[in-house]
UniProtKB/Swiss-Prot annotation:
The keyword Cytoplasm applies. PANTHER family: GLUTAMATE 5-KINASE, ISOPENTENYL PHOSPHATE KINASE. Catalyzes the transfer of a phosphate group to glutamate to form L-glutamate 5-phosphate. Keywords: Amino-acid biosynthesis, ATP-binding, Cytoplasm, Kinase, Nucleotide-binding, Proline biosynthesis, Transferase. This is Glutamate 5-kinase. Pathway: Amino-acid biosynthesis; L-proline biosynthesis; L-glutamate 5-semialdehyde from L-glutamate: step 1/2. Substrate binds at residues 55, 142, 158. Its EC number is 2.7.2.11. ATP binds at residues 15, 178-179, 220-226.
Length: 272
């Protein structure tokens, strides 16, 4: 059934987190980025339209500036992310070029998708880039985003951002790459008998209770934000796959119908 479901998928948003791009020692995982570029380029060659939502600016910045941990001051966090964003996009551009794929950068804040005029502008930008066969690479604009009681321009994390991008671009599928195999019925790091949920058809209280845990040293997203992203996909009749990003080539296996990760897809008439 999964292969049949994905045959009609045209537009795909792929989200990769910092933990999938940065090694445990803080160095950049060049091999994984190369594999990701290969997969996306292969999908483009097959007629798919792909948007990449990529975290990693902080991780790249920490590596470039030889910093062992994330600064505590907001201004310094923004500075590190600003440096890292340039380094990350430079590397993406170089590696994608090996596969004859052109990329672009779109940096967003929440204000952009809240106000109708700016939302229309960014939507048109996405459509123009896609029509030219370009892969938009999206990240939150950390250098200018603020999170204050009277005015917040932050999305919270890139899990949520990826679902918002999928919504405004009317993507058919969101593929979320993470450092976990999918959604389990309970925390697999604590319970040895935790079982992977292969298919989720609705976001219930039980599903929400399965989610937990904060982000890693480099990233901010946890399981709950991924569940919320799946709910957002459901709201516009989209679907989502949460899978381990250890080998980005697994994306191709999933789209061929192999059961990996957790597939979030509501049951429709004719599916039962």
């Amino acid at each position: 059934m999964m292969k049949r479901q994905f045959e009609d998928v045209k537009r795909i948003v792929i989200k990769i987190g910092t933990s999938s791009l940065v090694l445990a020692n803080g160095k950049i995982n060049l091999e994984k980025i190369d594999h990701l570029a290969f997969v996306i380029s292969s999908l483009m060659n097959k007629g798919k339209e792909v948007i990449l939502v990529s975290s990693g600016a902080m991780g790249f910045g920490l590596d470039l500036l030889k910093m062992a941990k994330r600064p505590s001051q907001l201004a310094k966090q923004q500075a590190v992310s600003s440096v890292g964003q340039v380094a990350m996009m430079s590397l993406y551009s170089q590696i994608f070029a090996h596969y004859q794929t052109t990329v672009s950068q779109i940096l967003l804040t929440r204000d952009v998708v809240v106000f109708p005029e700016s939302l229309a502008n960014v939507t048109n930008a996405f459509e123009s880039l896609i029509s030219l066969g370009i892969v938009p690479i999206v990240n939150e604009n950390d250098a200018v985003s603020v999170d204050e009681m009277d005015h917040s321009t932050k999305f919270g994390d890139n899990d949520r951002l990826s679902a918002i991008v999928a919504r405004i671009t009317r993507a058919d599928l969101l593929i979320m790459l993470s450092d976990i195999d999918g959604l389990f019925d309970k925390n697999p790091t604590i319970y040895e008998d935790a079982r992977l949920r292969s298919h989720v058809t609705e976001i219930t209280e039980d599903i929400i209770a399965s989610a937990g845990g904060a982000g890693s040293r480099f990233g901010t997203g946890g399981m709950l934000s991924k569940i919320q992203s799946a709910q957002m996909m459901f709201e516009h009749q989209g679907q989502m796959i949460l899978m381990n990003g250890a080998n980005p080539r697994d994306i191709l296996r999933v789209l061929e119908g192999e059961k990996l990760g957790t597939w979030f897809k509501q049951i429709e008439r004719g599916d039962a």
